[in-house]
Amino acid sequence: NSYTKEIMRDTENLQKKIFKEIEGRIKLDDESLPFKDKKYDYWTKTTKEGNYSKKLRKKIGSDKIECYFDGDLEAKGKKFFSTGDLAVSNNDEFLAFSVDDKGGEYFTIFVRRIGDNKIIEKIEDTAGGIVWSYDDKSFFYRKHDSQKRPRQILQHRLGSPSTEDILIFEEKDERFTCSIDTTSCEKYYTIETSEHTTSETYYFHKDEKKFEPKLVLKREDGILYSLDSFDGYWYIHTNKDAEDFKILRCPNDKMNDWKDFVPAKSGTLIGGLTFLKKWIIRSEISNALSKV
């Protein structure tokens, strides 16, 4: 702003020098490594001329590259532009993305049909955080309270007005904020509500006619835990009775029958799990060294 510009006027040359040095250490024309998701490889590209990244994909076995989101194109003509979330539907046909173009941290969600680039849905004044339903007939998103805290999870069905969106979950404690995610087994949704040192998780199955989140473990002050499901088991990463965390698991049909999967280790920080088709990856840190 004008005040900052005036106060810092005598450092303008130094600012330019520092900026050029920082810029010189960054590879502006760059592409991320691709990652496979269902039928496509996805990656991100940045250019020296642009201020925002491009999101690209290529069907596996094809040479045709699609740009399904161009940040510079979306930001054109806007004084402020910030992307909240990008989510491609499970059938690869739709892109849901959230944008704040005013700087107030209220995001408008758009749904674009990737094939013809047409916007087919728009929901204003959300907190972003988009998660598609497994059948691609709807998606979930977060809603702010009056203090800009995301404390509601709503479901929007494609083709219906946003006034008919269904409230799936609401956090009553003003200290907590909530988010929604899918599990690695692609059968459940999880809702996590948390503050800095305490968390609580709910889950519901994708085939439920009416989604009713079920509590996993009741919140306890100072206890953090996160939930995932894979290959018939629930997994919890928690610091309950484990200062540096541990991992428990139980069968999907025996939610309370928790057993140690990765026990706590004194002086070792236990990281979470990543599930692949045939492998489980985990990390830990001990003696200031990371291990996978």
Describe each PLM feature range.
Residues N1-V292:
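Beta-propeller folds
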